[in-house]
Amino acid sequence: MYRIPYKKSIGEHIPAKLNSTVVDFTAAMFGNKENWGSRVYFENLYLKDGQKDKDRAIPLLGANPTSFQNYLETDNTGKAAYWNAASNIRGYKLYWHKKCDWRKDKNDKNQNVNVSKEFAPLKQGHTFVGRLRFENLSAVELGALANVLSLGDDGSSAYKLGMGKPIGMGSVHIKAKLYLQNDAYYTTLFSEAGFDSGVELGDKQKYIGIFKQYMNEMLTPASLRLYNERIEELHYIMDDSHLQDSSWAAKTAYMNINNGKDKDLANHRIPLPSIKDVVNKR
């Protein structure tokens, strides 16, 4: 069997606007390789309570069927696009929150100890604390950062951090508070309680409002509508309340090469559902 090369590279399917030379919020705040450094710094997170035993994860070397329609947008007819077509990549790589039986019985004689990796996963209910520092951010940039860290304030939106995201690990809730340097930061060393930290609790909603106002003023009505739709879909995929749905595991399961239905998805080039289709929002 011979592989036929595509006329277009993968990079040609990335929307041109994403290859723009205009500096966006992400590049401005987190740096751009050798051009300029980051103004946001992640410190270590510390576990508030202890954890003892390690678990052994299942080997993740099995083949998973895939096809190009998983990665490209479909046309107006709903048919799958091809790499030679003038179609864009579907979007960003994100993972659903899911419950997976990723543990492997250590007494299982069929497991290959050479490919099984021991690690200490975060157990449910544990809490980490830490700081994310920033410097020289404008009010709009600070609002953008605060907005990202406040997506989980609704109590049902969880983030994905660390390893094991594809198998259901790394789902965490974040509660962020904003602290700002006050006028005494460089002038006062001691306070009645001891050393003066020189910081005070800030109003993150104030800066989030500044950021949202900036977006409303800078984006065209069409771009703003598209932005709001993407934020809506982001909330859908971050929503961990779906885990209470008895059919959720089947909806978000990976394709299996031994499953006839999954083979049909690839063989017949059936486009995968959108986020809204998965959560039945349309």
What is the predicted role of each segment?
Residues M1-R282:
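Basic, Gly/Ser/Thr-rich N-terminal segments that form RNA-phosphate-binding interfaces in CRISPR RAMP
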